[in-house]
């Protein structure tokens, strides 16, 4: 019997320092570990885009082999700084239409497709291909496409959390959808070192082109009991934000035990999580995606690393697996974050079933969803 082939066809760019690119690569790695023949196809739309498997392996720190094909991208998005939103939608539509037509008319056969891209989903669904669309947020175009293709029998939807599925239920057919939170490669957390007295934030210092409010975290840490016993460690980029934070700390909190490490490799970031005692999730409260629809990769890494976890009391965070163990604080209220930091001294990390947060389990569920 021939092995079923899966094509992960997406408008994302690789390699990239983004959580969404990490999530896609992680999915593919674990589908591959489950003996699936997977091919990643994406546009070469950024200056640093590359379909070299060795470059991809180095950035995302893995050893598995799978097929990668970068497709040329002769469209405006990424080439100009003006009208970026409009150029994204136009370029996305044109690239998806041309690329899906090319793939479907080629001699290479795929049994299933997975995508995170609206127009890729639309054209594959329209051509009656078996496709699973990973839905991570809401947009007007997405609602329209989901509504138009809601009764397509081979078109399936994977929602990142229950709130997202509920919000889009009137645009979809629920029998063709499922909810799968993000997960973690638990093998990376098999051997945990002795915990250091560290509070850690790991992630991009910007989200949706806005600064994550790291100053808010620093101010709360400064007035907490942990300021005299723990180190606050902030890991992430871009470098411009790193330098701004370092200047801010030098001017206002030079006596505090704070380390701004900037971006680290995947391996080094995981090692820092494993040795920390407390992990903090910060999100932008004015953004609906952050507030309602996210399932942060870092949450699952903190959980697997046996960290005590502090997070803003957003509905998305409250819908996470094992959320009853999270120390919640009111977004934007320094005193409440200080209280959560103080409380973390006396609580224990969450008890959890590794299989429930494993990317391997998630991959198995995706395979079952595709094949039924």
Where are these regions (language model features)?
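Conserved donor-binding/catalytic core segment of Leloir-type glycosyltransferases
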Residues: 7-9, 158, 184, 192-222, ...
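N-terminal strand-loop element at the rim of the active site
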Residues: 10-18, 30, 36-91, 121, ...
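Nucleotide-sugar-dependent
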Residues: 19, 208-212, 267-272, 279-301, ...
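Carbohydrate-associated surface elements
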Residues: 163, 183
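Short amphipathic alpha-helix
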Residues: 20-32, 217, 298, 366
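A charged, aromatic-enriched C-terminal amphipathic alpha-helix characteristic of glycosyltransferases
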Residues: 187-188, 332, 339-372
């Amino acid at each position: 019997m021939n092995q079923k082939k899966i094509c992960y066809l997406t408008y994302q760019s690789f390699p990239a320092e983004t959580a969404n690119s990490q999530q896609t690569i992680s999915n593919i790695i674990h589908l591959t570990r489950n003996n699936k023949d997977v091919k990643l196809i994406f546009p070469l739309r950024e200056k640093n885009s590359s379909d070299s498997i060795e470059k991809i392996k180095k950035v995302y720190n893995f050893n598995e082999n799978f097929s990668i094909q970068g497709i040329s991208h002769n469209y405006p998005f990424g080439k100009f700084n003006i009208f970026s939103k409009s150029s994204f939608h136009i370029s996305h539509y044109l690239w998806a239409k041309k690329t899906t037509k090319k793939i479907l008319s080629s001699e290479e056969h795929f049994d299933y497709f997975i995508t995170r891209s609206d127009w890729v989903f639309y054209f594959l669904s329209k051509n009656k291909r078996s496709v699973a669309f990973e839905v991570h947020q809401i947009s007007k175009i997405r609602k329209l496409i989901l509504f138009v293709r809601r009764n397509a029998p081979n078109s399936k939807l994977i929602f990142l959390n229950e709130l997202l599925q509920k919000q889009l239920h009137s645009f979809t057919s629920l029998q063709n959808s499922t909810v799968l939170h993000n997960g973690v490669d638990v093998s990376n957390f098999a051997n945990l070192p002795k915990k250091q007295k560290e509070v850690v934030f790991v992630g991009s210092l910007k989200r949706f082109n806005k600064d994550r409010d790291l100053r808010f975290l620093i101010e709360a840490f400064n007035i907490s009991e942990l300021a005299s016993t723990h180190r606050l460690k902030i890991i992430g980029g871009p470098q411009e934000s790193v330098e701004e934070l370092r200047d801010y700390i030098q001017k206002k909190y030079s006596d505090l035990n704070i380390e701004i490490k900037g971006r680290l490799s995947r391996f080094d970031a995981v090692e820092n999580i494993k040795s920390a005692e407390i992990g903090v999730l910060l999100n932008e409260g004015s953004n609906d995606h952050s507030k309602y629809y996210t399932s942060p990769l870092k949450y699952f890494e903190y959980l697997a690393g046996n960290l005590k976890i502090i997070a803003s009391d957003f509905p998305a965070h409250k819908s996470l697996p094992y959320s009853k163990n999270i120390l919640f604080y009111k977004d934007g209220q320094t005193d409440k974050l200080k209280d959560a930091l103080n409380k973390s001294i006396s609580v224990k990390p969450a008890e959890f079933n590794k299989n429930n947060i494993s990317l391997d389990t998630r991959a198995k569920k995706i395979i079952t969803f595709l094949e039924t």
